[in-house]
Amino acid sequence: MSRRKEGTKLKKIITRTVTRKKTALLLLSLMAMLVIPATTVGPKAMGATGRSFDNLVVILMENNGYCDVMTSCGGSGSYETSLAQTYSIAGSCQSDSSCSSGGYSGTSHPSEGNYISLVGGDNFGHTSDGYCCWGLAQSSIVAKMESAGLTWQAYAEDASGSGSCSFDPPRHADHFGFLTFNEMHTSARCLHFLATTSPSNPSGSADDHEFLGSLNAPNPANMTWLTPNDNDNGHDSGVSGGDSYLSNLVPLILSSNLFKTHRAALFIVYDEGNSGCSPSPCSGSTNDFLYASWSGPVVKQAYVGTGSYNHYSFLKTVETNWGLSSLTSNDANASPMTEFFASTTTTSPPSGNQPASFWTNPLVMPVILGAILTGIVYLVVSRRRSATKRRVVQTSETQAK
């Protein structure tokens, strides 16, 4: 065999070996490229998982005390009584001013101060209706939620200006406390003020299809608020009208995608009753116990609360659930309503949107190790083949000599 042929053959062997090594390295690189996109995700709302619930729906009813509603002490809310007996009720009361166990009170008279307190932790001196709009410089629960990466939306039946800062419910801000806060007066936040269509008749089938549609959406908000109109909330139609409305609407809520597939809770509460109220800053001499009921898959069943609560307790419950700081001393000192939930998980104060960790994904290390082993095996086999071919060449050269 000529030296030229021998050199050409050896060159081909070296070229094949280098090519195989490059191929192995390319294989490892491709595997790494496949692993990283498959296991690295975009921003994740770290605050979405709550201590007791991940999603909250709130419905505000109007102007009736505990015993106006509960049939156990003379009320006429048969559906609301059944719902409370199935899931939970805050307290066992014998009158609107007396409970043998627990109880939930309003914080103001008339309505608007209660609505402001529910989202702001105080009525800020507004002890009558008619205050609107954007005048309060204080902060609300919305700002706390948004800073934690939590989402929200607030519906009002038959409002005009849906999704804009011209949003105007039938009772203006009297029954929609969000409108009193100046920080809400931005186009980004006003997008979350939404109108929903009320039933044509309070005793007919519930409509509210816009509101219900949001509960069946792929990504429901962490908190969804509903202010019914004055027929549906019992303000003008009395307990029987409001009870009929809820008897149609609540089953649709509890059978929604949100309540079937998420850790969701429904809170139904009246803004105020018909008597005095004693928790500060309310200036009554007697309690004003209200119907306040939690329901849904995360709520205890057939449970009667033993703690003493008011509207600030609702706010405290939201803050405790998602690790949010207090707005005022009122909610800071209130008791959270955690006793109503079947189980709780420890949650740290959420820190907003953060990327999920690549290395903590359980699929990452097995795939990387598999890729490395595959590459090593490929290199070993390639080297053995190259060594065998070199021996063949050397044998051929020896024989030629």
Provide a role label for each language-model segment.
Residues 1-19:
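N-terminal secretory signal peptides that target proteins for export/translocation
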Residues 2, 32-34, 47, 366:
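Position-driven detector of the extreme protein N-terminus
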Residues 27-37:
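Bacterial N-terminal signal peptides
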Residues 42-350:
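N-terminal pro-sequences and low-complexity stem/linker regions of secreted or lumenal proteins
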Residues 353-368:
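Juxtamembrane/start-of-transmembrane alpha-helix segments at the extracytoplasmic/lumenal side
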Residues 371-401:
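C-terminal membrane-anchoring or membrane-association module
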